[in-house]
Swiss-Prot record:
Pfam families: NLE (PF08154), WD40 (PF00400). Required for maturation of ribosomal RNAs and formation of the large ribosomal subunit. One of its GO terms (biological process) is maturation of LSU-rRNA from tricistronic rRNA transcript (SSU-rRNA, 5.8S rRNA, LSU-rRNA). This is Ribosome biogenesis protein WDR12 homolog. Residues 7-87 are annotated as: Ubiquitin-like (UBL) domain. Its main location: nucleus. Belongs to the WD repeat WDR12/YTM1 family.
């Protein structure tokens, strides 16, 4: 019988002190994979119940045995491996779903804290937009709170501004408009929040596909089928201006919601895309990303209005996402079913050096969302009806959700960066369903 090969391993972590094991090297079987290593950490920490852990060697997630990792990286079995352990991300389970009258085109769950992180009962609000033109508000159990006719022809995008700007929400639609809304609490004890139109932004000549606020929330960008990428002034100061106008009786004409509305002030027109600009992300105050049907992803210097970097691919870019902690990195989904990552610190435009293919779906990748509390985790959604969770340090998905019965069109995380955690997802699609997923172990 062959003698069992062992490897010296030193376990390290950035977790709090009560989750740290001694860094003294220990000998472990070389055929151990993630599960076996997780058992060792749980044993050393005497955790009850046990917790799942993931492991990294030189920044790469371990998905093979230690022996296979040594061979793949041409490392000696005599050397001591430094292995970092982190909490494993466990795919969530569907908690609730609720029907819409039409396709669900966009969702935002950043103002909703799931039950697992709020003492047993969900709190906050989830917003959704759909092809019937309605903006809907839901509580943490996906019970209807309010709805308002927001856009003629359908809502394309719904996005909260950062909390520093108060309870302000942006929507865009097929009617060429962008609108800003104020969420306010009802005076009735059992009633939920309501929506009031604050401002209407006109400047696009075709449907507005997406909006994204700057980190401060004082500006936002919009993009659409007219090939335009526009930067606007917005935020709390505009809400205040609208309120002042109402108080002084100098009202502008409003649309379909009650209350007075200001006319949004336009800013820069960032020119460069040759076709529909499908998506926009704004990770740093002076730097934003856009993606379009001209197969390109562009990083813009907002101050100069010029494209700082451009990646030219071979297929239409349908969605993009970024993270404030890694503003040089952008994830984007394409019509060739691939999810890609572009590190703009690499050689711009070089597929070999700057862009990596994270993974693939069975259909167009229509939505991607970066976890607000982790720069390593993203989720993607596709026309194949699935949602996949990824750690960008490996090309193997962490898990897949397949509850939708038709194309998934919208995706977001529950809880924002301000909450310091994200323990769930919310999604919508062509099956006219809004779905919520929760887990005890996602990212915190």
């Amino acid at each position: 019988m062959a003698e069992e090969t062992q490897v010296l391993v030193k376990f390290v972590t950035k977790l709090p002190a009560h989750l740290r094991v001694p860094e003294t090297p220990v000998a472990v079987p070389s055929d151990l994979k993630r599960y076996g290593l997780s058992q060792i950490i749980n044993h050393l920490l005497a955790l009850d119940p046990p917790r799942p852990f993931d492991f990294l060697i030189d920044g790469e997630l371990v998905r093979k045995s230690l022996e296979q990792h040594l061979l793949a990286h041409n490392l000696s079995a005599e050397s001591t491996l430094e292995v970092e352990y982190v909490p494993a991300v466990v795919p969530p389970q569907q908690k609730n779903s609720t029907p819409h009258d039409d396709w669900v085109s966009s969702v935002d769950g950043s103002r909703c804290a799931p039950a697992s992180s709020s003492g047993g009962s969900p709190s906050g609000v989830v917003v959704s937009g759909s092809y019937d033109g309605l903006l809907r508000l839901w509580n943490g159990d996906l019970e209807a709170v309010a709805s308002v006719s927001a856009h003629a022809g359908g809502v394309n995008c719904v996005r909260f501004l950062p909390k520093s700007q108060g309870d302000l929400l942006l929507t865009s639609g097929k009617d060429r408009l962008v609108k800003m809304w104020q969420l306010s609490s009802s005076e009735e004890e059992d009633a939920g929040p309501s929506c009031r139109l604050v401002a209407t932004y006109r400047g696009h000549e075709d449907g507005v596909e997406a909006v994204a606020a700057s980190p401060s929330g004082r500006r936002f960008a919009s993009c659409g089928w007219d090939g335009k990428l526009l930067v606007w002034e917005g935020g709390e100061q505009l809400r205040w201006a609208a309120g002042t106008a109402e108080a002084s009786k100098k009202k502008r004409k409003t649309g379909t919601a009650n209350g007075s509305a200001a006319a949004g002030a336009g800013g820069a027109d960032l020119r460069g895309h040759l076709h529909c600009v499908s998506s926009v992300a704004w990770p740093a105050e002076n730097s934003l990303f856009s993606g379009g049907w001209d197969h390109s992803v562009r990083r813009w210097d907002v101050s100069s209005g010029a494209a700082a970097d451009t990646y030219n691919g071979s297929k239409a870019v349908l969605c993009i996402a970024s993270h404030a902690a890694s503003p040089a990195l952008v994830a984007f989904g394409c019509s060739d079913r691939a999810l890609r990552l572009w590190d703009t610190r690499g050689k711009a435009g070089s597929d070999a050096l700057a862009v990596t293919t994270q993974g693939a779906h069975g259909g167009w990748v229509t939505a991607v969302a970066w976890c607000p509390s982790s720069q390593h985790h993203i989720a993607s959604a596709s026309h194949d009806g699935t949602i996949k969770m990824w750690d960008i340090r490996t090309q193997i998905p962490l898990g897949m959700l397949s509850h939708h019965t038709d194309k998934v069109l919208a995706l977001g995380w529950l809880g924002g960066a301000e909450a310091g955690h994200a323990r769930g997802l919310v999604s919508g699609g062509a099956d006219c369903q809004l779905r919520m997923y929760e887990s005890d172990y996602i990212v915190s």
